[in-house]
Amino acid sequence: IIITDHFCDDYFPDIKTLYIPLEGLSNEESSMILNTYKPICHLSIERCGQNAEGRYLNARGVDIKEFTAPVDELFKKGSQTAPSFGIGDGGNEVGMGSFAEVLNNKELFYDYCVIPCDYPMIA
């Protein structure tokens, strides 16, 4: 199953896709999704995630929260039950919180995503 937002409509026509609304999911809705589909892993590819202030910043440091469904909230919850993988290249992606010690260097990076994962990969 693919879990994304409506900005990715029709990207996966042959795969069951759930669309997270921009306002996010309740705790009960998140639990229902995880209990229904019982994922064997969680994979985030180049997905913007929250920084320490709860903001979603693009690669230029611009806040894009109004265009970003909080899929990372479901990722955090799911990562407690199955291995998680995050692929990113700018520090603002889900999973890059695993590199917090490096990304905390403000001379090199703006506010990075704080959501870690089990297996982060740099693209």
Residue ranges of each PLM-predicted region?
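A glycine-rich helix N-cap at a beta->alpha junction
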Residues: 12-34
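Active-site charged/polar residues at nucleotide-handling catalytic sites that mediate phosphoryl
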Residues: 37
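Short Asp/Glu-rich motifs
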Residues: 11-12, 96
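Short internal beta-strands
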Residues: 1-6
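Conserved mixed alpha/beta catalytic, RNA-binding, or beta-rich assembly cores of soluble enzyme
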Residues: 21, 41-123
